[in-house]
């Protein structure tokens, strides 16, 4: 390894110019205070000059009034911005003002989404104690969720009258609407809470219930159509096409013969000409089958009559793969253990078969004609 020694050239310090001395940096002391003092002196000089000019021009008194009013407003602003005093200053005129004491208010930022959801859930479940606890915490009574529902709407949707009454008495807005423009009454009627609506109007309106929230309608059951209909709409339902088609015994009802041929068919017209009617059976003597024969689909190995099965015309729908699916699937050996087990079973069967035809005396004599 090659090393080299490098030395700096000799410095001639004695040849330096005495005027070229090193620069020394000194930290400033009280420069800011001096500048502030100088600026304040300049401001006072400008104000004295302006006051002297205003006094000379005759507007000194007006200018002083403006300055005094500005100082009063500044004091009012400082007083209202003080967080320790709950007061509000109301200016009545140019020279007078009033101080009004404010009630302590709770900010909405103190409640999170969990509190809002708990408040709405308590209204939905009818939990009066939980509702009172949230009201004591000064929660906004008309707070809404993502869908625009308030606690009053949740209570009305479930028919919780006591909760809805408590919220309305504590100042809840009865005319609030959700994102679908539905109010408290509309939501209750939509959920079938007509008794709740009647009770609500009886309590708050002394029974002055509007026509939209009348007593629950009486429903009647139509056995032919298998539906419930309002009692005042029974005549409309009876005259409907659905009810007339289901009423087979009515005069002039459509025939239910099950024959899928029309009056234009030549065979149909020949049978009618011979005195046949749709209520009679087919054939020369009118005693034949008019409907398809109902059968029983047997898919097991149980004996006949062992099971009480229902006779049907159609046992499965179209494109139903389960109808042609084999219920018992043969097990195919897939693992090595199953293959070995199957091989041992086949060997055992072959061994037993050979043992039955072993080279015994009786078998030998039989095949050689000695018996």
From Swiss-Prot:
It comes from the Eukaryota. GO terms for molecular function: nucleic acid binding. InterPro entries: Ankyrin_rpt, Ankyrin_rpt-contain_sf, G_patch_dom, GPANK1. ANK repeats lie at residues 147-176. The keyword Cell wall biogenesis/degradation does not apply. Signal peptide: none annotated. Residues 48-57 have a biased composition (Polar residues). Residues 32-57 are annotated as: Disordered. Residues 263-309 form the G-patch domain. Keywords: ANK repeat. Residues 32-47 have a biased composition (Basic and acidic residues). The keyword Magnesium does not apply. It holds the Pfam family Ank_2. This is G patch domain and ankyrin repeat-containing protein 1 homolog.
